Amino acid sequence: LIEVDFSYNTVGPKHSVTYNLRALDAYTGKQVAGVDGTGTPTFTSEIPVLLEEAVVGHMDNFISRLQAYFDDCRENGREVVIEIGVFDNGSGINLESEYGGSELSEVIENWMAENTVKHQYLTSESTESTMLFENVRIPLVKENGMPKDAGSFANELRKFLKTKYGIESKNNSPSLGYAQIIIGEK
């Protein structure tokens, strides 16, 4: 996403614009490139002309930052957030339940380590009922070449839990960069 904010300035007969140009990652909403500044005051008062004159000198810098971000995504994966929650349906399952000698939270952590790009993720919360993984780096595309988002990545984890441990879960993916798996509910 590209955002442009600007203000129109008038000093005597001369006009300029002060602008802020930002590129945002559509998955995370984080700013990945940006430039700002004020154009040289001129006698023209047409806002599109003033914006073009103000921004054109900074576009190479903006584009190089954007390209660096794309290069980082290609090498290190796209960043998403994955949340795990346990639905209390009376089954007694929680993230401290044991499976093959490991707590379910450890099973999930191990899966994350094996399936993220270069094992990159941060466990920012881990309790009996919730786990939150931030800065999760996932591949840009699936094996079939289609784009991968947080929901498709979370589906892989959901299928793993069902196949290997018989754990029912539901994938709730409200956005491209965020997915939530609810364990104990289908």
Locations of the language-model features?
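Short flexible/disordered coil segments
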Residues: 28, 32-41, 65-73, 137-155, ...
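C-terminal/domain-edge helix-coil "capping" segments
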Residues: 30-120
